[in-house]
């Protein structure tokens, strides 16, 4: 899944609280649309499909998903720019599943606001990330059992890890991650 910047961070000019200037958003959105055309476009009929073919890959990649944002703070700036990108992708490529973000943690304001935005826009999937202690993983094996299955938005758990002080990995962290993942099979309905 290619993950594109939400136009709110990762840009050296503005930091996570800033955003690409609104005057630059149309060009930025076009770059994302061009990426999708490059991945999926017909090599005989599209500009970017032709570039892909000339670069040695004549067949489309059949891209189905694209991530927009990664651990963003869910601010008004984020919401405005994400919504512009999301709507442009849905308009031009309705078959593409946009994977949104619900902030850098699995709790707190950004998580709550990220889910509100997902519900409001009907984002098909969000990428949750979390890094927790072994105790958290042991005591939250039912985390996704509580997930409301009637929601349109599904969860993609793109990043997770058990951390102990110093962020070292050892047998304890490996086993708690394995124990945490065991009930996922039942939760993935």
Please identify what each model-predicted range represents.
Residues 1-118, 131, 135:
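Substrate-binding cleft and catalytic face of glycoside hydrolase catalytic domains
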Residues 88-90, 94, 115-118, 124-189:
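Catalytic-core region of carbohydrate-active enzymes that cleave or remodel glycosidic bonds
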Residues 64, 123-124:
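Short, conserved active-site loop motifs that form the nucleotide-linked donor/cofactor pocket
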